[in-house]
A protein has these predicted regions:
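Single transmembrane alpha-helix segments in multi-pass membrane proteins
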Residues: 1-35, 61-75, 159, 212-221, ...
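Alpha-helical transmembrane segments of polytopic integral membrane proteins
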Residues: 4-13, 32, 56-62, 83, ...
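Membrane-embedded helix boundary and interhelical linker motif in transport proteins
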Residues: 13-59, 63, 240, 244-254
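Hydrophobic core segments of alpha-helical transmembrane domains in multi-pass membrane transport
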Residues: 29-33, 50-56, 83-91, 130-139, ...
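Alpha-helical transmembrane segments within multi-pass membrane transporters and channels
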Residues: 40-84, 90, 225-230, 234, ...
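Transmembrane alpha-helical segments in multi-pass inner-membrane proteins
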Residues: 40-51, 173-183, 187-188, 193-267
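Transmembrane helix-bundle core of multi-pass membrane transporters
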Residues: 67-68, 73-144, 171, 236-265, ...
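Helix-loop-helix "hairpin" substructures at the membrane interface of multi-pass membrane proteins
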Residues: 117-199, 220-226
Length: 286
């Protein structure tokens, strides 16, 4: 959700197709891993990753994104894809091509008992709670604060907002940096679960785009619901499809085909949403 929220803010408000958003996620994971190795503090790792990637976001917005905003979406796709290639090469130069280890906090390494017969990993539960809290905070920021009103005003009518004294370029810089920091936090939190490696941003970017399309571009609520639906469909598919396929095919075939069909189910869900709600389930208004 954090990655989808950052990207939907940038695309929905700034009208920038930023394929390099996954590279910011990757940068956050690598910085967090490096900080964790040096300090041993996971909290410091997350904070340093967010700040460092936020600084990268400032540089990227001032040097490239601000210029790409004046171009069409094709130029934006090509320009930000070039950033992906550069980021991957920089990561290889600094950390090497091998995956980097990022350990989760020792206090959250075990399970917690949710029900008498149900144990759940404490770290994953923390991520869920953090994601829900972040969703509520972002929704409140965009819809209930003066800064959020200014952001939406700048997105709706830039010229009118400028005439009213709003510094739209500075406002959009803040939105882009916020998106970069959200991606970095997501990378730091998911690093202990997934492998911190070169190209990890591209792997998750497709799913993030699916979440945004399902939920509605520019909508925080839509990004949250889209991420929730994608996660539920993927998890349910991986859990139940192999069981169903074993009724027809051999266990080996069912185990290999089931996860593939679960991934396909995500895109079937997206297609169904686009047929009945072309703007997504919760499109941004105004």
């Amino acid at each position: 959700f954090l990655i989808a929220a950052g990207l939907t803010l940038v695309f929905g408000i700034m009208d920038i197709m930023n394929l390099a958003h996954g590279s910011l996620y990757m940068a956050g994971a690598y910085v967090a891993a490096e900080t964790m190795q040096r300090t041993g503090s996971f909290t410091a790792a997350v904070l340093v990753a967010a700040v460092a990637t936020g600084i990268v976001g400032v540089v990227l917005e001032l040097t490239l994104i601000r210029r790409l905003a004046l171009r069409d979406h094709l130029a934006q796709v090509l320009g930000t894809y070039a950033v992906i290639l550069i980021a991957n090469d920089l990561v290889k130069m600094i950390w090497g091509p091998a995956p980097v280890m990022l350990n989760m906090p020792a206090a959250l390494s075990g399970p917690v008992r949710l029900l008498p017969d149900l144990l759940y990993p404490a770290y994953r539960l923390m991520i869920i709670v953090f994601g829900v809290a972040a969703a509520a905070g972002l929704y409140w920021f965009v819809t209930r604060t003066r800064a959020g009103v200014l952001v939406r005003a700048g997105a709706s009518n830039r010229q009118m907002a400028t005439l009213m004294g709003v510094r739209v370029p500075l406002l959009f810089l803040g939105v882009f940096v916020l998106g970069a920091m959200l991606a970095a936090v997501a990378g730091a939190l998911l690093g202990p679960i997934t492998s911190v490696q070169v190209g990890m941003g591209e792997e998750i970017l497709i799913l993030v785009l699916v979440c945004i399309v399902i939920g509605g571009i520019g909508s925080i609520r839509g990004a949250f619901v889209g991420a929730l639906l994608v996660g539920m469909v993927d998890t349910a598919g991986r859990a139940f499809l192999p069981m169903l396929l074993r009724q027809v095919f051999s266990p080996a075939v069912a185990s290999s085909v089931g996860p593939t069909l679960a991934a396909i189910a995500i895109y079937v869900l997206m297609a169904a949403v686009l047929v009945f709600r072309p703007s997504g389930l919760f499109p941004a208004r105004g």
